[in-house]
Amino acid sequence: LLGLWGCTAAPVKELPDNVKLSEPQSRMGSTVRLVDAVTFERQGAVKQSPATCVSLNVDNSEVTLSDSSASFVGSYTGTYYDIESSRKEGGGATLQHADAESGVVVAKGVTEYTSGGLMPIGHAARYKLLVAPMPGKTVVQFKDIEYAQKSTGYMENTGFQRLGTWWGSGVMDAYAAMEQQADKVLDCIYSESLIGE
């Protein structure tokens, strides 16, 4: 088990330049950093309302987290009792603030991703999203990013925690999911029409 943890706690060495990290800190014998923000931008003049595009493309649904940590083998019968528990976390309104004059939008969202090669592990990342139109470009920034493994099997599911640079967080897969989310919002903002053909 410790050998496996060592693989998951090992830090990811290179992240894209648009990822802002915290100061280094120790985690299970490795030096890692937390992800403070991930920022994307696109050049051009805004064509659609950022608030509308966030409402159409960002979801803040509840996430179901589960485990089977209460499972046991009966002492007299030797029968295995698989006791799965689950709970829902998060949810609520997506839009937190929308300024019609400046176009600035603050929202909460969640996206799901998988990490791990041969044995994919389902994760969810929740975040605060800032969309800020500026002269000649629009910035989309993810902050307060937390992740959780959706099912932890026989280990207790401790829920969401800050996203960091260790392999076990699936940080690069989380990054790809955020990039895809940002692209959806930006594609909408720069589209000629909100009505699909």
Please report, for each region that a protein language model flagged, where it lies by residue:
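Beta-strand/loop substructures that line and gate deep hydrophobic ligand-binding cavities in soluble
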Residues: 120-169
